[in-house]
Every structure is written in structure tokens, then in C-alpha cells.
UniProtKB/Swiss-Prot annotation:
One of its GO terms (molecular function) is manganese ion binding. The keyword Metal-binding applies. A divalent metal cation binds at D72, E73, D164. This is Ribonuclease HII. Its EC number is 3.1.26.4. It is found in: Cytoplasm. GO terms for cellular component: cytoplasm; ribonuclease H2 complex. Keywords: Cytoplasm, Endonuclease, Hydrolase, Manganese, Metal-binding, Nuclease. Endonuclease that specifically degrades the RNA of RNA-DNA hybrids.
Length: 250
């Protein structure tokens, strides 16, 4: 077997017996391929184990035959745009290993996972509260109301919620988890859905207000965004109660 053929074999599902045979091959090139293969397999196994561990909270409900929704938000800190929340119900068939805290994923990876989550989830709900609402009732309360909106948008009612460090104003049992998107696959899936949904909204706003660089900053106070604010002033989607936007209304 040539080294090229060994490489092709190792790109498939090989058995331990096949590996044992290959390990007898004295060629340096073959041994390097085997070491690389075993490293990749160890990495994949660790990823699978971490993924399964992030079902620990969900399993508490699944074992009772209950559904639980993960809830998360994105857009608390920006100077412009809405706060967006998502509620996602998954079950034991959910197998998207790459689902994790959205902040740990590249924009490309989030975009790849978004339709897959929508397809595999039992139900997905979205909540959106505008900059005007945020200014009216404050970001914390707008966040809570958007989370409630997302839960109510689910077409299947959950028995309980797993929430990333918040309390949602709905009549359901809740477990609040600090850094929940790193501890629960349901919350992680919700964080990805909310992030991609909000990024798309900000891309749409960029077509109306192209000066502020929303596709690059998502409404956060980057230098580009602040410079545009100084030059052009705030738009209707800017949060009037957030500094330095608030300086324009004094």
C-alpha cells in the first residue's frame, strides 16, 4: 500500500485491527499519518464528550418526559439596533457537535449552524425589542420582555426554561445558569440563533444607514461607529439613553 493509499484509508472509518496493521509499517510517512490520525480522533472524542456533558441540565427534564427550552439574548451592549432573544427546544436526537457559545464561533460557522439548528430543533422562537423600547423601559427590562416574547413564540410549549443568567417573566419553572451558553446545548443553540438573526437585521439596517458600518460592528461602539456618529449624528435605531448617543439629546 502506498503512503497516498494509507492517507486515503485513514480518511475513512478504519478499525482498530486496520490501525494495528498499519502501525507495523516501518515507513516514517505512514507513522506520521497514524500519529496525526490518532490526534484527530482524540480531539473528536473530547469534543463529543464535552457536547454530551452540555446535555446534563436538559437530561433532568428529558428523563421525566418533559421538554425544556434554552433561552439567550444578544445585543445588550450596542449603541444601535434591537436586543434579540431566542428560545430553542431540542431533544435527545440533537447531534450538532459544533454547537457551542456563539461567541466562540466564527461568523461563518454560525451561519452554517443556523439553518441546521432550525431544522433539528423541536421548536424555535424569536423575540425582538427595538431601540425605542429599550430607551423607554431600560435594557434589562427590554431583555426580559424579549425573552418572554421568544418563549411565547414557540409553537410547542416547554415544561421549563434554561436561561443564561436571567429570569424570564413567564409562568414556567426556570434554571438560571451563569455563562449558560457554555453549559447547555439548548442555550448555546439559542445564542447562535439570536446572534445570526440580529446580525441579519443589522445588515438590513446598513442598507438604510450605510455610514455606520453596522455589518462590521453590529451596532457596538467601535471607532468607525463613533466617528460616524460624530459626523452624521444618530439614526432612529440608535439608543438615545446609551452614552455617547445620549450626548446628542442634551
Amino acid at each position: 500500500m502506498t503512503i497516498k493509499e494509507v492517507k486515503e484509508l485513514l480518511s475513512t472509518d478504519v478499525t482498530e485491527d486496520q490501525l494495528a496493521e498499519l502501525e507495523k509499517d516501518p515507513r516514517v510517512g505512514v507513522q506520521k499519518l497514524i500519529i496525526s490520525y490518532r490526534k484527530k480522533q482524540a480531539k473528536l472524542l473530547a469534543k463529543k464528550q464535552a457536547f454530551l456533558e452540555r446535555f446534563s441540565y436538559e437530561k433532568q427534564f428529558w428523563q421525566k418526559g418533559e421538554l425544556v427550552a434554552g433561552v439567550d439574548e444578544v445585543g445588550r451592549g450596542p449603541l444601535a439596533g434591537p436586543v434579540v432573544t431566542a428560545a430553542v427546544i431540542i431533544d435527545h436526537n440533537f447531534d450538532l457537535l459544533e454547537v457551542n457559545d456563539s461567541k466562540k464561533l466564527s461568523p461563518e460557522k454560525r451561519l452554517q449552524l443556523y439553518p441546521k439548528i432550525l431544522s433539528e430543533a423541536v421548536s424555535v422562537g424569536i423575540g425582538v425589542k427595538s431601540a425605542a423600547v429599550i430607551d423607554q423601559i431600560n435594557i434589562y427590562e427590554a431583555d426580559r420582555q424579549a425573552m418572554a416574547q421568544a418563549v411565547k413564540a414557540l409553537d410547542v410549549k416547554p415544561n421549563a426554561l434554561l436561561v443564561d443568567a436571567m429570569n424570564v417573566p413567564v409562568d414556567l419553572p426556570q434554571i438560571e445558569l451563569i455563562k449558560g451558553d457554555a453549559k447547555s446545548n439548548s442555550i448555546a443553540a439559542a445564542s447562535i440563533v439570536a446572534k445570526v438573526f440580529r446580525d441579519k437585521l443589522m445588515d438590513d439596517y446598513d442598507k438604510i444607514y450605510p455610514q455606520y458600518g453596522f455589518p462590521r460592528n453590529a451596532g457596538y461602539g467601535t471607532k468607525e461607529h463613533i466617528d460616524a456618529l460624530k459626523k452624521y449624528g444618530p439614526t432612529p435605531i440608535h439608543r438615545k439613553t446609551f452614552a455617547p448617543v445620549s450626548d446628542f439629546f442634551k
